[in-house]
C-alpha cells in the first residue's frame, strides 16, 4: 500500500465534514499535517464515541469507498476502542479511545485547525505515542519531541 497522502487527507476531511462526523487526525498522520517531515501508510483518526457520530462515520466511510462488513459497521457505530480498515482506497485506523488521552472533548478543546483539518495538538499526539509504548512509537518519539520544539516556535498563532 502506498503512503497516505495529502489528497487522501482532503477526501477524508470532505466526506467526514459532509456527514458531520466529529473526529481529529491523530498519530503520525496528524503530526504530518502539522508539518512533521515523515510518511505514513494510513490515516489515524480519533473519533468522538457517540452512536450518532459512529453511524455518520459509517456513511462517510462507505461514501469514500470502504467496503465495510456488518461487523465492522457495528464496531464503528458502537465505538469499539480500535478499528483497523484495510478494505478501502487507503488504510485507516479508527481510534475511539487512544492511549494517553482522557476524553475526546479534552482533545477537541486543544485541537489545531490547519487548512481545515482538525488535528490533535502535538502534545496529545506525543502523549498517545508515549502511553502506547510500541516499539515503532518509541523510535519516532525523539524526532517528534524535537519537531515539537520547532513547531511551538514557528506555528502560526
For the regions a language model picked out, list residue spans one by one.
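Compositionally biased terminal segments of proteins
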Residues: 1-157
